[in-house]
């Protein structure tokens, strides 16, 4: 049942226009076409860019493989893009895979033994590596060697294989799920942060140019403000606004055109969609602002518990519209203000069975 709920949550996330997860293979292909190729083209993440520039320049001067890199942060912020940029800037090949795909030690061994000197191996969702595969990775990262078993039963023996020097780039949205031994083997650890509206407006303007779409400065900024700090969402909204501009306007994306298009798509001024508003309005109107238990809230809005916890809540909490408390979910003053309501002077409603009430 739990696994079914998780799958349902993933399906809901993929269906949302403002989801940070890739919606389809077609969208992934679209993202690749817009992806910056070099570090100078990469917008935002100034601290991470500065660090990587220094580390890569030093590694190239010494003609060494770049130290292993761990990139973590929310989805859609450019971890995969940075992995490709690292390989291109270092002038080496990139091999890409993901944690769930590497089911057996042999899967990883096959990748490692085919790497050329200083190549980049990119493992997305690295927190989902199985323990047995992770064990193979440790000596590969430290000593550029792997131990493989030859034969079966009593006749089995371990053989040590030397590898070419390489760089592992691991990406994860859940750094806390990495084991300490794996995390400690990364020499470069970088957290990607949400983007500012100004940074996203630059990304939208660049993407519009690649798409041959005409866009005004205020139109790019309007899309950026509703993109939840995430380039993937910004590019997705740009595609839909471009369609609207070509059909309903003269093809130029102005602020007014962007506002009308996004209103049609139910994306409001702060990037909330219908599901975000449904959740907050349920807490505000049905439960007097909270606290309300997660199961009651799920029943009230007709969604699975996992969908609320994994898909809807994170952004609302991060933006300060919702709080998780020991007694349940509580709407904040920002939530009341967003819906034009006055916050209750006595605070949120208390639990009927709260002894402190």
Curated annotation (Swiss-Prot):
Residues 196-266 are annotated as: Small ATPAse domain (RuvB-S). It comes from the Bacteria. Pfam families: AAA_lid_4, RuvB_C, RuvB_N. ATP binds at residues 34-35, 76, 79-81, 142-144, 185, 195, 232. Signal peptide: none annotated. Residues 4-195 are annotated as: Large ATPase domain (RuvB-L). Belongs to the RuvB family. Has 3 domains, the large (RuvB-L) and small ATPase (RuvB-S) domains and the C-terminal head (RuvB-H) domain. The head domain binds DNA, while the ATPase domains jointly bind ATP, ADP or are empty depending on the state of the subunit in the translocation cycle. During a single DNA translocation step the structure of each domain remains the same, but their relative positions change. NCBIfam families: PRK00080.1, ruvB. The RuvA-RuvB-RuvC complex processes Holliday junction (HJ) DNA during genetic recombination and DNA repair, while the RuvA-RuvB complex plays an important role in the rescue of blocked DNA replication forks via replication fork reversal (RFR). RuvA specifically binds to HJ cruciform DNA, conferring on it an open structure. The RuvB hexamer acts as an ATP-dependent pump, pulling dsDNA into and through the RuvAB complex. RuvB forms 2 homohexamers on either side of HJ DNA bound by 1 or 2 RuvA tetramers; 4 subunits per hexamer contact DNA at a time. This is Holliday junction branch migration complex subunit RuvB.
